[in-house]
Amino acid sequence: MNNSLDYLAYPVIVSNHRQSTTFRKKLDFGHYVSHKNRIQIAKPTVDTKPPVAHTNHILKLSKLQGEQKKINKIEYENKQLCQKIANAHRGPAKVDCWNEYFSKSLNRETRNRELVRITMENQGILKRLVDRKPHYDRRASEIDWQNSRRYIRNTTRYLLSQNE
């Protein structure tokens, strides 16, 4: 404590040995120290600590693993490209600018199946036409022809030639 202010805080009026200033100073200092200790060990009744942070909420392992896979894939592709570049520099010169484009159709198989089906149907129709036998009677048609020639000969004014 400050000694210059002792005379104001503790006046020198001594009527009793219990009222001596040094004893009173000791008591006040003891109370002060105990009060200071109680303040230091006091705990607040309101919890002012931050909430408990779980690492699995902050640090997403699945995202880290996904990023690591992407990085590994990129590194692998870079390594492959470097090997191709090294092989191109090491080996003989080659022309590799041929752009062979093959038309890719989404329904090529369907069109091929349809074409095969139509071809088979056409071949079947052609076979039926070739195998078909005439159904008219030749003898009856010749008799009919002779009758019509006779009718024409009888009705015409001029004679017909023999080969008509």
From Swiss-Prot:
Coiled-coil spans in chain: 61-90
The record's account of tissue expression is: Expressed exclusively in testis.
Task: Report if keyword Cell membrane is assigned.
Answer: no
Q: Which cysteines are joined by disulfide bonds?
A: none
Keywords of the record: Coiled coil
What does the entry give for GO biological process? sperm axoneme assembly
**Function noted in UniProt:** Required for male fertility through its role in axonemal doublet stabilization which is essential for sperm motility and fertilization.
Which family is this protein grouped under? Answer: Belongs to the CFAP97 family.
Q: What is this protein called?
A: Sperm axonemal maintenance protein CFAP97D1
Origin species, per record, is: Homo sapiens (Human)
- Taxonomically, what lineage is the organism? Eukaryota, Metazoa, Chordata, Craniata, Vertebrata
